[in-house]
Amino acid sequence: MVGEFRWQAGRPATAQVGGWVLAHCQQRFLQDDNGLLFPREWLKRQELPLLAEHGVGHWQGEPVYVLELDEPIELPGMAWAPLRQFMLHGDFDQFCMLGYASQIGIWARHNRFCGNCGTRMQAQDHERVMQCPQCGLHQYPRLSPSMIVLVTRGDEVLLARSPRFVPGVYSTLAGFVEAGESVEQCVVREVREEVGVEVANLEYIGSQNWPFPHSLMLGFHAEYVSGEIVPQEDEIEDAQWFSLDALPPLPAQRSIARHLIDLYLARRSGAAEPVLPG
């Protein structure tokens, strides 16, 4: 056990022998009846379309690596499972491990060659970076900062649904931070764009890594100021004010979207405040 957590992100050296390995491709992981972690040396002896291998951390003190595969090939007695499945169900420590491994795998896939001169990139031992030996370009794992906000109006909250959502589910508003703006400016702009209302008195609540594929969600509460709801065409299927005692189906418990809603409910009712997962 490492500290109080079973999973600890890190960079175990690929030159060392042994450990566990995850096989990843297109945000899916290979698994069999024993789970997702395979003996590293055994899996590497299989005929795999390997693109890259990276150390990603330790599980119960043992080093863990990710093999990024070119395609999700079929192996006897094994199947591919989507990352999102582990977010919704099962062990949260395991989901954190898989989310990190997926982001590193995607980064390795997308940065095999230099975007400046086309030379094959090389992983560095001293930090998590791909470097071009020809022109020196550095590429770090990508993070895309996004705001997510619950707009409130007393005992009402503004919730919306995208055409991509599970039928019937409503959630908070979210959007990516654009170049040149602060996260707070992004909150005001995205709310205005998505539902046509103005907000103020922003309160930062917390953040959550969201590996679909590489977002960092920064969560807020914001108070309604003015305006009528006008859903953004092609982005928002429906948006409504909901009373706290008559909420629609909501996002998964582990999501920061659900946490923003549950936290506001707790504060209005005087109940104990929930803890943000992760």
From Swiss-Prot:
Function comment: mRNA decapping enzyme that specifically removes the nicotinamide adenine dinucleotide (NAD) cap from a subset of mRNAs by hydrolyzing the diphosphate linkage to produce nicotinamide mononucleotide (NMN) and 5' monophosphate mRNA. The NAD-cap is present at the 5'-end of some mRNAs and stabilizes RNA against 5'-processing. Has preference for mRNAs with a 5'-end purine. Catalyzes the hydrolysis of a broad range of dinucleotide pyrophosphates.
Enzyme kind, highest EC tier: hydrolase
Residues binding Zn(2+): 114, 117, 132, 135
Protein name: NAD-capped RNA hydrolase NudC
Binding site for a divalent metal cation 1: 174, 194, 235
Lineage summary: Bacteria, Pseudomonadati, Pseudomonadota, Gammaproteobacteria, Pseudomonadales
UniProt remark on cofactor binding: Divalent metal cations. Mg(2+) or Mn(2+). Binds 1 zinc ion per subunit.
Assembly notes: Homodimer.
GO molecular function: magnesium ion binding; manganese ion binding; NAD+ diphosphatase activity; NADH pyrophosphatase activity; RNA NAD-cap (NMN-forming) hydrolase activity; zinc ion binding
Any one annotated GO CC term: cytosol
Reactions catalysed: a 5'-end NAD(+)-phospho-ribonucleoside in mRNA + H2O = a 5'-end phospho-adenosine-phospho-ribonucleoside in mRNA + beta-nicotinamide D-ribonucleotide + 2 H(+); NAD(+) + H2O = beta-nicotinamide D-ribonucleotide + AMP + 2 H(+); NADH + H2O = reduced beta-nicotinamide D-ribonucleotide + AMP + 2 H(+)
Motif (Nudix box): 175-196
Gene from which the chain derives: nudC
Keyword annotations: Hydrolase, Magnesium, Manganese, Metal-binding, NAD, Zinc
Stretches assigned to the Nudix hydrolase domain: 141-265
